[in-house]
């Protein structure tokens, strides 16, 4: 948001999704987190030093979320050996975000009105 932290991604996203898990609801203070999931090796911080906050997470075991120490914006989280989740609203052009699925709808709030055209999964989509 403020530009104190910058990152780049050198590969196409693995996928894009809306995560409705309780962890995402709490950290965004909203219904879900819009996530761009990219290959871990393609993600690089190019400016600044993010702060991190970690919590236990049913989704990834332990979720380490990076945020800007200046403005507090959540930037990324859910890092695994395979990939890195990036909060879509932190992209330079958030209109590039095109979610493929809604996941963890088992935790979705009753007031959360999801796009009826997107597939919905109680937890994770089946692995291909």
Kindly give the residue locations of the regions a language model identified.
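A short Gly-Trp-Pro
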Residues: 1-128
């Amino acid at each position: 948001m403020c530009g104190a932290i910058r990152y780049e991604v050198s590969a196409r996203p693995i996928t894009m999704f809306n995560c409705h898990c309780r962890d995402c609801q709490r950290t965004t203070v909203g219904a879900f987190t819009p996530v761009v999931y990219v290959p871990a090796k393609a993600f690089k911080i190019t400016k600044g030093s993010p702060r991190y906050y970690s919590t236990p997470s049913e989704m990834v075991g332990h979720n380490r979320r990076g945020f800007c120490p200046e403005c507090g914006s959540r930037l990324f989280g859910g890092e695994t050996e395979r990939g890195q989740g990036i909060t879509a609203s932190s992209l330079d052009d958030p209109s590039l975000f095109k979610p493929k699925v809604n996941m963890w709808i088992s935790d979705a709030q009753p007031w959360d009105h999801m796009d009826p055209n997107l597939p919905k999964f109680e937890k994770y989509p089946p692995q291909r």
